[in-house]
């Protein structure tokens, strides 16, 4: 089982070729443990299945609400945007606090990242930065050396797979991302180093 952070496209692709059963877990500090699993082998849909005696719903924001009586007597309200399939199944879309509002259009960075993931080998993320006209503009932040003109052009061709407002307006290269003690990318810390 894998958990602690969403499983990357590259890792999921590598796992799909191995003769083992692999699962991504969903959990958070408030739930103490994982409350749902998603098969990483043979399943094309990215659907989490809750564990026994756990049900889920979505609040008015579209965020996951967890009902797990053995863990908490109160529902646990998250900031995770989901597509609810049933009271026992959901698709994780991203974090509501990461949503980019660009020209009045709400963009989920994690959705854009999943589309671009098979075109990039280095670590990257999608972010919103202040823009006088749009409020926020979408940017692609890449770890490593600055891209060559040819690499940039190739990458921009892949942007065509995205919806118009999801397409990054700029590509920012940073030699090393800021990280948490556990190795997760600190998006805000990384962006702050650019300013």
State each model region's role.
Residues 65, 91-93, 180, 186:
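Generic structural signal for well-ordered beta-strand positions
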Residues 1-43:
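Gly/Ser/Thr-rich phosphate-binding loop
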Residues 185-195:
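Phosphopantetheine-dependent thiolation modules in NRPS/PKS and related acyl-activating systems
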Residues 23-30, 48, 127-130:
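Beta-strand->loop->alpha-helix junctions that form or flank phosphate-binding loops
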Residues 160-184:
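AMP-binding/adenylate-forming catalytic domain of the ANL superfamily
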Residues 76-166:
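AMP-binding/adenylate-forming catalytic core of the ANL superfamily
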Residues 55-77, 81-83, 89:
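AMP-binding/adenylate-forming core of the ANL superfamily
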Residues 27-31, 78, 102, 180-182:
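Ser/Thr-glycine-rich phosphate-binding loops at phosphate-binding pockets of nucleotides
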């Amino acid at each position: 089982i894998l958990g602690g952070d969403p499983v990357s496209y590259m890792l999921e692709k590598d796992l799909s070729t191995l003769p083992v059963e692999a699962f991504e877990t969903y959990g958070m500090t408030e739930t103490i443990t994982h409350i749902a699993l998603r098969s990483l082998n043979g399943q094309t849909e990215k659907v989490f299945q809750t564990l026994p005696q756990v049900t889920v719903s979505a609040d008015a924001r579209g965020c996951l609400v967890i009902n797990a009586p053995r863990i908490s007597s109160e529902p646990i309200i998250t900031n995770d945007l989901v597509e609810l399939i049933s009271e026992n199944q959901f698709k994780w879309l991203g974090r509501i606090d990461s949503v980019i509002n660009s020209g009045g259009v709400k963009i989920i960075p994690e959705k854009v990242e999943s589309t671009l993931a098979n075109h990039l080998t280095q670590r990257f993320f999608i972010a919103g930065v202040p823009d006088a006209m749009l409020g926020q503009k979408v940017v692609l932040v890449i770890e490593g050396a600055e891209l060559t003109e040819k690499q940039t052009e190739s990458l921009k061709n892949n942007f065509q797979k995205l919806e118009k407002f999801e397409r990054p307006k700029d590509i920012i290269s940073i030699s090393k991302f800021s990280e948490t003690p556990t190795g997760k990318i600190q998006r805000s810390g990384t962006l702050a180093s650019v300013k």
